[in-house]
Amino acid sequence: MNQGKIITVSGPLVVASGMQEANIQDICRVGHLGLVGEIIEMRRDQASIQVYEETSGIGPGEPVVTTGCPLSVELGPGLISEMFDGIQRPLDRFQKATDSDFLIRGVAIPSLDRKAKWAFIPKLSVGQEVVAGDILGTVQETAVIEHRIMVPYKVSGTLVAIHAGDFTVTDTVYEIKQEDGSIYQGSLMQTWPVRQSRPVAQKLIPVEPLVTGQRVIDTFFPVTKGGAAAVPGPFGAGKTVVQHQIAKFANVDIVIYVGCGERGNEMTDVLNEFPELIDPNTGQSIMERTVLIANTSNMPVAAREASIYTGITIAEYFRDMGYSVAIMADSTSRWAEALREMSGRLQEMPGDEGYPAYLGSRIAEYYERAGRVRTLGSQEREGTITAIGAVSPPGGDISEPVTQNTLRIVKVFWGLDAPLAQRRHFPAINWLTSYSLYQDDVGSYIDRKQQSNWSNKVTRAMAILQREASLEEIVRLVGLDSLSEQDRLTMAVARQIREDYLQQNAFDSVDTFTSFPKQEAMLTNILTFNEEASKALSLGAYFNEIMEGTAQVRDRIARSKFIPEENLEQIKGFTQKVTKEIHHVLAKGGI
């Protein structure tokens, strides 16, 4: 432990002297109040400390004491359904302990509840050899999540004691005799430094799609379990709603939602909505698989920088148990602004638009911790982390540094479009500018699993939308009537795809989530209409005759998004009705 004294205070940055025995990334207690801070720069005996709490009232001469430990998170039962701040202080228990609706400075509360007891069920027996990552036993944390207690990193040997029963997170539950003869006494909890990624046995190629229930994403721009995606867009385009929708309905085991520097009301929405929503995959409340990290815009700036790392470390812990995890960061731009503020106060040489020169490497560090892995341990298991980051470029300009550095790393770009949002087309993901580099892998995976021709249907639908974009210029100049019959059909089908398929109402109880079989049935109906109508045109039918003759069935196709999942056969039946109606037009003599 090293004690120095403050010589400078500049907002969240404190400089202390007499710190020659301290190390970079050490956690310190700053001032008489004991504020939490982290050393981010050392110059001779002077340490620059990033303080994670409000520094007003702190002055030169006050003491600074190092703990000798890096910023770490507590990992164990009690994480799920909890809401933490950026440095893993539990907000619910913080409020009860301080009897205040505001974050009282200098209050230290353990992240995991020390009084709660958890029923531990051993899976191994005394005498067995264990290595780091082995699952010793389980705790049923919620109705959905079985918390697997693992041997900590760098611990291996013979299991000499293991106890069943109810324990707190600090009670000794097992003992391991290590190779050097020492006895390691383990509890249900372990700690891990947030800036260091948890080790894995092997990184694997992600192939399984993450089904989000959002048609534009699952169809045209899918992300895999273990992939990384970015959602850039201007203000009001719907970034947060897209993030909320994925957090609610993605087919993952656990969701970590990091509210980083955004509005407090958005976290309030999450707290109000999530407990009432039922996960379509498990039938339980969505909160039973969710961890919330709230670092809103009115909370200390420095803690924004830590909140992203806190979230990804918790995600890695659950991944190591063999779970698939999705982490939502809303928004990485606010995190980058926190980096810029600290860099400016440190008087570092600025890069593009004032951001630090190391912005790209920090963003890469975060997204590279996502992926599909084979975990440590003698038991074979795989886990995944899917990282989805919202980016808020000022004025929607995606050429700014945060967006560009993010796009260099992630493989999926869901570009939100202000004109689409103004036309009330939500999700406002622009199908002409967005992309997914997982499209081919996911298409092949689905074709193989479903024994269907899904990838071909997606290609045909996208070709229709691209053809519409090229025809729009002509339509604006000379009008729709100047187009050929075939091109008018293309415009009509493209409108169907846009309005009846891609547009989705997040606030409608049925339309908010669409399962993959329903998506395929809906898209098949639209493409069948295009195919049959195109054949009818080639046989001499008139475009207007086809549109009038199929008006009723097209209306049913448009309404199929509001048909519940259990009536899927009804949607599939529209395919035959489309063919029948067009054949009826031909038989009637629409030539």
Curated annotation (Swiss-Prot):
Keyword Ion transport found = yes
What top-level branch of life does the organism fall under? Bacteria
Q: Which UniProt keywords apply?
A: ATP synthesis, ATP-binding, Hydrogen ion transport, Ion transport, Nucleotide-binding, Translocase, Transport
- Give the EC class as a word: translocase
Catalytic reaction(s) noted:
ATP + H2O + 4 H(+)(in) = ADP + phosphate + 5 H(+)(out)
Q: Name one Pfam family in it.
A: ATP-synt_ab_N
The cross-references to InterPro entries, in alphabetical order and at most eight, read: ATP-synt_VA_C, ATP-synth_a_Xtn, ATP_synth_asu-like_sf, ATPase_a/bsu_AS, ATPase_F1/V1/A1_a/bsu_N, ATPase_F1/V1/A1_a/bsu_N_sf, ATPase_F1/V1/A1_a/bsu_nucl-bd, ATPase_F1/V1_b/a_C
- UniProt keyword Lipid metabolism present: no
* PROSITE patterns associated with the record: ATPASE_ALPHA_BETA
| Molecular function GO labels | ATP binding; proton-transporting ATP synthase activity, rotational mechanism; proton-transporting ATPase activity, rotational mechanism
| A GO biological process held by the record | proton motive force-driven plasma membrane ATP synthesis
Identify the EC number(s).
Answer: 7.1.2.2
Instruction: Summarize where ATP binds, as residue positions.
Output: 233-240
GO CC terms: proton-transporting ATP synthase complex
Record function comment: Produces ATP from ADP in the presence of a proton gradient across the membrane. The V-type alpha chain is a catalytic subunit.
Family indicated by similarity: Belongs to the ATPase alpha/beta chains family.
User: What is this protein's name?
Assistant: V-type ATP synthase alpha chain
Q: Which organism is it from?
A: Streptococcus pyogenes serotype M5 (strain Manfredo)
User: What's the encoding gene here?
Assistant: atpA
